[in-house]
Amino acid sequence: PTGGVNGQNIGEFIAAPFIHAVGGSWVCPKADIAAGNFEKITELCKQARSAALGFEVAHIGLNCEDAEAASAVCEKLNEAFALTVKDGNSSMFASGGIEVMKSMYLGKNGHIAIRTNSVPLAIAELAKKGFVCDMTTAKYKGGRMVAVYLKDEIGGFAVHLLQK
């Protein structure tokens, strides 16, 4: 779609599984094209790309040796900050922001989850910047990739993308 798309809603469009591209004249106003104001157009394109990707921190993951250790970490977080604990199969969450793994998973120190409006778009954008995804870690839901880890750690943390 191109009609009705703007900087405030482009992320909603790109997150829809049936939409593969979006556009709109707001990125390249006729007056700026006529005036040769390509710096402004370039900046609008960068803003549109950023809004389309919609990167945000989803949660931080901490690695623990086993379920008992994970439970102890969550209990301390609950005791200190009254964070609600939710137990899962392979991990526990203390609030929605801290995932405590029940085993030593990817990342020396744990992992950082980054939400995005489009995992495939994020993979392409990161590749342009020299970041490679480990496609063996990709997870799919209904034929759509919803998660994948970067190949290299950042600061001792594995980093994975999550579909919003």
Regions found by a protein language model. Name each.
Residues 41, 45, 70, 119:
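Aromatic/hydrophobic pocket-lining residues that form the small-molecule binding cavity
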Residues 50-74, 107-114:
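N-terminal beta-strand motif that seeds the catalytic metal site of vicinal oxygen chelate
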Residues 27, 36, 55, 92-102, ...:
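Vicinal oxygen chelate
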Residues 15-19, 54, 106:
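Alpha-helix termination/capping residues and helix-transition junctions
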Residues 13, 48:
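Conserved, mostly hydrophobic/aromatic
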Residues 108-136:
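Mid-chain, well-packed structural core segment of small domains
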Residues 61-99, 121-128, 139-146:
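Core segments of cupin and vicinal oxygen chelate
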Residues 3-9, 18-41:
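Glycine-rich phosphate-binding active-site loops on the catalytic face of alpha/beta enzymes
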